[in-house]
Design a protein with these regions (language model features):
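Mid-to-C-terminal alpha-helical segments outside catalytic/metal-binding sites
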Residues: 275-313
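Short acidic/histidine-rich active-site segments
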Residues: 227, 254-277
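A short, acidic, flexible beta-alpha connecting loop/helix-capping segment that sits on the rim
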Residues: 52-54, 267, 302-307
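Second-shell loop/turn segments in exported
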Residues: 60-61, 235-237, 272-274
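Extended, charged catalytic domains and RNA/DNA-binding interfaces, predominantly
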Residues: 2-226, 230-233, 245, 249-252, ...
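Soluble non-cytosolic domains of exported or imported proteins
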Residues: 30, 238, 242, 274-278
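Basic/polar N-terminal segments that are highly enriched at the extreme N-terminus
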Residues: 1-2, 313
Length: 313
């Protein structure tokens, strides 16, 4: 039994086309984890396609890299216009679904795309960007990722406020612990962790602490469960959906019911039970078999993200 819909808050499929030097017209490449054909035909699908900005890119190099991938996104939306539709809102997503198309949101992973220029937030919003991860693993002009110890910069705080004003969701996945504390002092609106799990279950620093989770609950934020093996179990050991379910149970125990999915397709090593879009859709039936209510299961698959979009995009 498949769900009515599935909303995936993160994949690296778009920049995988450029990053590996392959042809750009590959949203339907069968050699990738995520392709349009691989999406179950009976599931209304929404996908956040991230432009990943490598840590080494700064200034004009970061802008050029972003624009190359933005242009590729636009080309692919045109190339596959009968199967996928670019979206900027929940209503756009619903319209795409009603037309039998995948809903595609353009996002960014790495605030270096701003090149330290606050006026670029408006430019990104005008381009259709609807979510931006502030950092990747290292440092950029906004702050520091989990491999470093510094917090957010003054520019990063300014960028968060501007993103909120321009309708770009603030994504805190990859931000380090100090940066989280700074973000909590800065953010005025609900934000997202597009692809993060619970650190109490898997101790990787990329995952959220209990205090972070509680604060996100208090602020009506959204958390996307990450499929990366290294963020599900310590050492990436094990290959059972029960491993991911332990994170869900822990989130629930902290009052974090506003969970979603953030696959990291084409950007991470995945367990065999989550290494295709069809298997991700199978989570719905698995949740029901575990005794989860239909309401909670549908919430994780799509309803929580859909409602968050309606309120915040």
């Amino acid at each position: 039994m498949n769900p009515y819909a599935l909303i995936d808050l993160h994949c690296d499929t778009l920049t995988d086309c450029i990053h590996k030097g392959l042809t750009p017209d590959t949203l339907d490449d069968p050699d990738r984890v995520l392709s349009l054909t691989a999406i179950p035909s009976d599931v209304h699908w929404a996908q956040f396609y991230a432009i990943f900005i490598p840590d080494q890119h700064r200034g004009q190099a970061a802008i050029d890299y972003y624009e190359t991938n933005r242009d590729n996104f636009n080309r692919q939306m045109e190339k596959f216009h009968d199967r996928i539709s670019p979206c900027r809102s929940a209503s756009d997503m619903q319209a795409a679904w009603e037309a039998g198309k995948t809903a595609a949101f353009l996002t960014i992973e790495g605030g270096a795309a701003l090149a330290g220029d606050i006026t670029r937030v408006k430019k990104l919003a005008d381009d259709g960007v609807r979510c931006m991860t502030l950092t990747w693993n290292g440092e950029n002009e906004l702050g520091s990722g989990h491999t470093t110890t510094h917090g957010m910069t003054d520019f990063g705080r300014q960028a968060v406020r501007e993103m909120e004003d321009r309708g770009i969701l603030v994504d805190v996945s990859h931000l380090n612990d100090t940066g989280y504390a700074d973000l909590f002092e800065t953010a005025r609106r609900p934000f997202v962790a597009t692809h993060s799990n619970a650190r109490a279950i898997c101790s990787h620093k990329r995952n959220l602490t209990d205090d972070m989770i509680r604060e996100m609950v208090r602020r009506n934020c959204l958390i996307g469960l990450n499929y990366c093996k290294s963020f599900i179990t310590d050492g990436g050991i094990g290959d059972s959906p029960d491993d991911l379910y332990r994170h869900i149970e822990h989130f629930f125990s902290l009052g974090a019911y506003e969970n979603a999915l953030g696959s990291d397709f084409d950007g991470a090593a995945l367990p065999t039970y989550l290494n295709t879009p069809a298997k991700a859709a199978d989570l719905y039936e698995y949740f029901l078999e575990k005794g989860m209510s239909k309401e909670l299961a549908e919430g994780i698959m799509f309803r929580n993200a859909e409602e968050f979009f309606r309120k915040n995009l």
